[in-house]
């Protein structure tokens, strides 16, 4: 099957936003207008096409990023709908990694919200060009220019309107195009009857003003345009469009569109914007990777005749076809039934079937081409972040970094039958979601699951029940504390056993020093003259890493320390890797007395939005939770309080906020950093853990 759409006419985009800004509804409308869906699905009715997991339809939020493909004006647009809830940040992170551009959806009343800041930061990290869609223009309190201002104030983004709304709230009837300098009027609620008209007289001056501002903003980024502008020459529509496209692709400029997806207004013009301003796979730099054996850096051009390379960005278990691996093809082509190399794991994999996904309905295809996003059936070894490539041209593309989980709960199967199925369910869920971990506590024998927040774990337990038919009891949440050292010290670890038969001998001197917060564990071998033979050094490092899993204070993992192996001794006959491993772990235990170990706890960045009259109560409540208020601002007639609060104090906060504000307050939180636990609280935690 030949290529249906050229690379120039392909767009790989994501739709990202704060929860409830209307991402899924926007995607639904895109699918409706591109002829993919015959009846529009509504999120609040639980029938949206992209929200295809049962839990999503019940909760009205998007959890997994469903990938779908649509066609518009001779272009193929591959869309990934990403969740806006902070607990699912990893889904956003992994879809951004494989996208070429994105639409950021804002709520016209709220503008930029906390989760918008998080996803915006992530998109900036990956250098993803964006256009902005100010949605919900029909909502009470909708204010387009306020929303644009929040882009400048909160994100320092060089964002300018390429459209203006005609009216707002229930008077929102049309849109002015500031590039073409014309207007569009909507005649009905399905938004299909759209008429191109002259700009209404009473909007003429405003349109001229913002047209001028747009040209000025774009000219600043384009020398040729700047010269014409300064010399007073007329800038044509084509020149303006080309300059906006160039600046957007260079991530220097963000065009802002407006509309109401729910009322079907502005979506077709937004699709035009995707085609006009977001990059094709050819417009962005070729992806770079490393040749495994030589560590040499290479580029993989987005061409069908280049060697095949792709990145697996999502694993899903499908009830009908089993394990689905979603991947983005960066170069070359791939046929179903062929073999590829998973260069990350050095395993050969056979591609069973290739599927193009449309939310949850699938179409089988025989070949995928450079720039495509598709799913494969039959990959056994591949997990999220792995590179798939041509067997003769190995390359490893940059993988993805995932945050460590910050919350854990113990779960117990309700019956013996559940116990057998639970292990399998947890394994499959871990394959799908790299921020979800499950392990058995060696001391209590309990199964502990860890994730990014309470909602994340709720949904995991829910999925176990529905998809894997596992009933489980869930314990109270536990915080992922860590331990670290405050002081430096030189410590000895000696393991000697010589009683009949072959003995054991391992002896090390290690200098422990505190490392910067967040830098993790660093090991240095400073042995001179072979007092500890080279072959035992890795055993010393492994012994330390193992011992660090159970800290000296309260059994929590030890982080952010440096260990320098500088002396020791060995025995020709009795020394072994095992002996040195044990000696190293003894050194770590001995360090407890000298290095002043302390407990660390996760601190969450919290943003609470409340009516002004509750401000005093909420501030008092945050302080009582050991929180530090970092700032406040008015947003419309509400107050926004930003604070840093220990995670341990945030359990059940949703309920308490509801009762404190008669249900009128909302909050969001995201993990920020680890900080030392105050001594009186640390003592209690240590006591509890030692069962005193």
Curated annotation (Swiss-Prot):
Any GO CC annotation of this UniProt entry: cytoplasm
PROSITE patterns linked to this entry: G_TR_1, G_TR_2
Binding site for GTP: 17-24, 81-85, 135-138
Keyword field: Cytoplasm, Elongation factor, GTP-binding, Nucleotide-binding, Protein biosynthesis
One Pfam family linked to the record: EFG_III
Signal peptide bounds: none
UniProt record, GO biological process: ribosome disassembly
Ranges annotated as spanning the membrane: none
Gene3D superfamilies the record matches: 3.30.230.10, 3.30.70.240, Elongation Factor G (Translational Gtpase), domain 3, P-loop containing nucleotide triphosphate hydrolases, Translation factors
One Gene Ontology molecular-function label: GTPase activity
This protein's record includes keyword Endoplasmic reticulum: no
Keyword field contains Cytoplasm: yes
InterPro entries, alphabetized: EF-G-like_DII, EFG_II, EFG_III, EFG_III/V, EFG_IV, EFG_V, EFG_V-like, G_TR_CS
Cellular compartments annotated: Cytoplasm
Domain tr-type G: 8-282
Main location: cytoplasm
Membership in a protein family: Belongs to the TRAFAC class translation factor GTPase superfamily. Classic translation factor GTPase family. EF-G/EF-2 subfamily.
Task performed by this protein: Catalyzes the GTP-dependent ribosomal translocation step during translation elongation. During this step, the ribosome changes from the pre-translocational (PRE) to the post-translocational (POST) state as the newly formed A-site-bound peptidyl-tRNA and P-site-bound deacylated tRNA move to the P and E sites, respectively. Catalyzes the coordinated movement of the two tRNA molecules, the mRNA and conformational changes in the ribosome.
Name of the protein in its database record: Elongation factor G
Protein encoded by which gene: fusA
């Amino acid at each position: 099957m030949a290529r249906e759409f050229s690379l120039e006419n392909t767009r790989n985009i994501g739709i990202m936003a704060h929860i409830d800004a209307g991402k899924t509804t926007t995607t639904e409308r895109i699918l409706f207008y591109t002829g993919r869906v015959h009846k529009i699905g509504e999120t609040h009715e639980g029938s949206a096409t992209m929200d295809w997991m049962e839990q999503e339809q019940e909760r009205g939020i998007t959890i997994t990023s469903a990938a779908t493909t649509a066609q518009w004006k001779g272009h193929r647009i591959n869309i990934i709908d990403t969740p806006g809830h902070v607990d699912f940040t990893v889904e956003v992170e992994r879809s951004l990694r494989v996208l070429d551009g994105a639409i950021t959806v804002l709520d016209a009343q709220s503008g930029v919200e906390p989760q918008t800041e998080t996803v915006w930061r992530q998109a900036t990290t990956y250098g993803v060009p964006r256009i902005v869609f100010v949605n919900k223009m029909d909502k009470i309190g909708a204010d387009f220019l306020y929303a644009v201002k929040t882009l400048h104030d909160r994100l320092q983004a060089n964002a300018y309107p390429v459209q203006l709304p005609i009216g707002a709230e229930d008077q929102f009837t049309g849109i002015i195009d500031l590039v073409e300098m014309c207007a569009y009027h909507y005649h009905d609620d399905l938004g299909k009857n759209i008429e191109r008209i002259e700009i209404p007289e009473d909007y003429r001056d405003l349109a001229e003003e913002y047209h001028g501002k747009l040209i000025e903003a774009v000219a600043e980024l384009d020398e040729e345009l700047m010269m014409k502008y300064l010399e007073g020459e007329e800038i044509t529509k084509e020149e303006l469009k080309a300059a906006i496209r160039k600046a957007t692709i260079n991530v220097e400029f963000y065009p802002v569109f407006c509309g109401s997806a729910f009322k079907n207004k502005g979506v077709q013009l937004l699709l035009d914007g995707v085609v006009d301003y977001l990059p094709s796979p050819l417009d962005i730099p070729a992806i770079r990777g490393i040749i495994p054996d030589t560590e040499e850096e290479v580029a993989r051009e987005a061409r069908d005749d280049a060697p095949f390379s792709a990145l697996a960005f999502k694993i899903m278990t499908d009830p009908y076809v089993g394990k689905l691996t979603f991947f983005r093809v960066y170069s070359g082509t791939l046929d179903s039934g062929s073999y590829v190399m998973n260069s990350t794991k050095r395993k050969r994999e056979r591609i069973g079937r290739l599927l193009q996904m449309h939310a949850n309905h699938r179409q089988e295809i025989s070949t995928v081409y450079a720039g495509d996003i598709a799913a494969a059936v039959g990959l056994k070894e591949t997990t999220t972040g792995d590179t798939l490539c041509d067997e003769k041209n190995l390359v490893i593309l940059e993988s993805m970094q995932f945050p460590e989980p910050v919350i854990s709960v113990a779960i117990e199967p309700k019956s013996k039958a559940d116990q057998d199925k639970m292990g399998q369910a947890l394994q499959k869920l871990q394959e799908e979601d790299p921020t979800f971990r499950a392990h058995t506590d060696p001391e209590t024998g309990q199964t502990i699951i860890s994730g990014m927040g309470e909602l994340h774990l709720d949904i995991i337990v829910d999925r176990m029940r529905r998809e894997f038919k596992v009933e489980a009891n869930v314990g109270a949440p536990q915080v992922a504390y860590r331990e670290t050292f405050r002081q430096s010290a030189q410590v000895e670890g000696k393991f000697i056993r010589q009683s009949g038969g072959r003995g054991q001998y391992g002896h090390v001197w290690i200098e422990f020093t505190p490392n910067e917060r967040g830098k993790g564990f660093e090991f240095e071998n400073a042995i001179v003259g072979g007092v500890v033979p080279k072959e035992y050094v890795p055993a010393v490092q492994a012994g330390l890493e193992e011992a660090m899993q159970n800290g000296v204070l309260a059994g929590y993992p030890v982080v952010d320390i440096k260990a320098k192996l500088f002396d020791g001794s060995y025995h020709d006959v009795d020394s072994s890797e095992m002996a040195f491993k044990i000696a190293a772990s003894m050194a770590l235990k001995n360090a407890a007395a000298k290095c002043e170990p302390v407990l660390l706890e996760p601190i969450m960045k919290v943003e609470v939005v409340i009516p002004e009259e509750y401000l005093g109560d909420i501030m008092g409540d945050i302080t009582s939770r050991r929180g530090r208020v970092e700032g406040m601002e008015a947003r419309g007639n509400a107050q926004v309080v930003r604070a840093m609060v220990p995670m341990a104090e945030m359990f059940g906060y949703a309920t308490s906020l509801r009762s404190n504000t008669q249900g009128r307050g909302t909050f969001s939180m995201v993990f920020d950093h680890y900080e030392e636990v105050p001594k009186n609280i640390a003592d209690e935690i240590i006591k509890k853990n030692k069962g005193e």
